[in-house]
Amino acid sequence: MRIREANPEDAEALAWLSGQLGYPATAEATARRLREIIAHPVGAVYVAEMRDRTIAGTAHVLAEYSMMDEPGAYLAGLIVDESCRSQGIGSALLRAAETWAREHGLTRMRVNSNVIRERAHRFYLREGYVENKRQAVFFKPLT
C-alpha cells in the first residue's frame, strides 16, 4: 500500500467510498469537487492505493483559521473501504493528514464523527484523539 495525493482519475473510487459512508456521489460530481480542491489548495486529499492499484481509502484534511483559536487542521473525511478495515489503512491515512497539517504550521487536528459511528470513535481514541464535545450541526442552503 502507498499513500499518495488524490487526482481526478480517482473520482470513481472516491465516489464509491463516499457512498459506503452514506454520502452517495457520482464519479462526475466527485471529480468536479476534487478539481476544485486541487485548484484552491487549503488542504489535501490522500488515497491509500493498494498493490493492485485499487483505492482502499481516502482522507481529506483542511486548514482552519478562526478568531477563537490558533490555526488548526480539520479532518473533513476519512473513509476506509469496508472490506479493508482493521489493516492499518486508516492509521496511515490519518498520519498523512497529520503530517500535512504539521508541514503547514498547524498545531492541532479536529475531527467530527457522527454519534452513531462508535467503531470510528474507538479508532480515533486509539490514535490519541480525545472527545472534546458533542454538538448539534445546523445546515442552510445558500442557493
Question: Where does each model-flagged region fall?
Answer:
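Conserved beta-strand-loop-alpha-helix junction that forms the acyl-donor binding cleft
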Residues: 111-120, 139-142
